[in-house]
Amino acid sequence: MAERQSNQRRFSIKNVVDVVRARRSGLGIALEMGFHQAEANRVAVVISELGRNIELYAGEGTITVTMHDRYIEVVAEDQGPGIPDVDRVLAGGYTTSQGMGLGVSGSKRLMDEFEIRSTVGEGTTVRAVKWLR
């Protein structure tokens, strides 16, 4: 389910269908803002990766996509187990699943700004930004 404000869409993530819905919407928003197809695809991939992590590790959470004048912002939030070693996750090569996904470190490389706040036992918030060029 998605909530919409004038420049923002919030998606409840509970399953793969929710992840696909958020990804498609994020792609459309990025294209609407004037991002080239390749850049819009990067935003969509990051939404998909973050949504997949919510589904796999937290069970549920939200992804919020916000349009700003010169950038798109993606915020993924959950109240799952948290990430014990954020630096290790950002360095790449760290996984707790057998998936072939891009992962957090790959998502970071696709965006212009990327930050993670996580507390073990309380959850994780990821903020990712792609600037319109």
Question: What role is predicted for each listed range?
Answer:
Residues 10-16:
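HAMP-domain connector/hinge
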